[in-house]
């Protein structure tokens, strides 16, 4: 293969500054593993404290829904640049009995919003939609959890109230939007230091206002957030600063049941969620790739096929939204027809594909959590605020900052609609049994990362750590393929080979530029889970100590 050998990118042993104030010794600075193997439950998340929150629930006898809810609330505290309780989520659940369901906690456009007359802002209150994270997590816990909500939310409340130490990557992200954060009282109070400027790596970020809000949610199951005094405060703040969300919008919001979409890839069952998520895109890309023989192709040839398959499938996102559209997009016949448009090596210069040009509307600022418990429940959960820090507007006194949904961000989205994106919580099953639990952060690159990890495992026989470390490709336009060259990336010979196929090629050495995945694999022969958190990120994978949920 024309990239660094299968030992791959080394999994980091992070020593981040994770000490939580007020003597929480269990979170003292320590080496952080990005992979784990266990016969018990397991969790992987993009921040060590979120993974610890999830494992804490498993160790207390909770199930995967408890762990995912805890990790999701926790990550909303410790990765505010990526997500928030004022944001959106998509949740895919495989139950212990083998059934699958989905929860749509996507932000929704307010009823009085008119895209023709609304400001085309790229941040601020005018971009704020109706938040869905709290409703999504409340539904996940109420319908599938087993521990008391106060127990499940305790880690997030602790992190907000006592504080956590900023990681190096967070410092860079917060600094990028410092001026925008300083524009509103709430965001300035939450994320700007008293002496000015954003928080640095190692600084203790305390969010006491957010802690109070989380306590209210834990006490009343989110009722105050959508229909009580918290809702009244949020609506007054948003409307008073040029936004559109009203108390009625908040009161009427519901986390909806997602349409589950299915497909197959080389004998494995694929399961995802339809729009607003991009499960059908991920399935179609894999089913296009299934039309080609991996064993007969070089690594550069397979990279070119993979990039095109993802590009073609991604063009489907705008046309999805009905049962018939989902069935067409995930059908083998449609994959066959789309595969005929893929250019194989030696076919001459690249021309336009079915994909068209698309903006990367989610940016790279999203987070993902994967959880499995020993009883067979699996959760794959994506949570986001859209671009970095979302709207960059927060309600003072509540500590809640909001996702960007409206205005210049998603432009022509209509009242009542939910913001569709490339988020793709995903499952791979073999003979009805768990095989992979996967998802990623990274905007339009999310399906690309998921598809390539799955292909590396199934087609190349890699374990998850190898598949995660292997270099990725992405096709941002009809004739351009980007290739990851940060070590251990694609070698120059591979880059030149793809260029020789007739594509323009851009070598991208920046780590983390090809999405950031979280993956679990069940090894049936060993009866154990293998978990890996993205090696280009600062996350963590942890196995539970307790063997079974209550």
Model-derived segments and their meaning:
Residues 257, 363-366, 421-423:
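Short, small/polar residue-rich loop motifs at catalytic or cofactor-binding pockets
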Residues 12-26:
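Bacterial N-terminal signal peptides
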Residues 303, 319, 375, 417, ...:
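Extended C-terminal subregions enriched in glycine
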Residues 30-52, 56, 62-221, 225-227, ...:
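Noncatalytic scaffold domains of N-terminal-nucleophile
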Residues 77-84, 92-94, 99-101, 244-246, ...:
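Active-site rim segments in enzyme catalytic domains, especially the processed small/beta chain
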